[in-house]
Amino acid sequence: MNAKVMLVCLLVTMLVMEPAEAGIWSWIKKTAKKVWNSDVAKKLKGKALNVAKDFVAEKIGATPAEAGQIPFDEFMNVLYS
């Protein structure tokens, strides 16, 4: 098989596969967006945020409200000191 025929086969394959892959990726993106914005995910994100604030507060010896206000750099310095 010469190079020109191989190139044509490759281009036809790409033209056929690209719409199919685009459909799959758009479905995955749409589903992930629905899951991320669901009520269960929002509750879990809120719980994770509260646990993280409590962890930081315990680690630095501050109240959770103060721990939520510190900059990220200071938080990382406290964790590794």
Swiss-Prot record:
Belongs to the non-disulfide-bridged peptide (NDBP) superfamily. Long chain multifunctional peptide (group 2) family. The keyword Lipid metabolism does not apply. It comes from Urodacus yaschenkoi (Inland robust scorpion). Its main location: secreted. The keyword Iron-sulfur does not apply. The lineage of its organism: Eukaryota, Metazoa, Ecdysozoa, Arthropoda, Chelicerata. Keywords: Antibiotic, Antimicrobial, Cytolysis, Fungicide, Hemolysis, Ion transport, Membrane, Secreted, Signal, Target cell membrane, Target membrane, Transmembrane, Transport. Residues 66-81 form a propeptide. This is Antimicrobial peptide Con22.
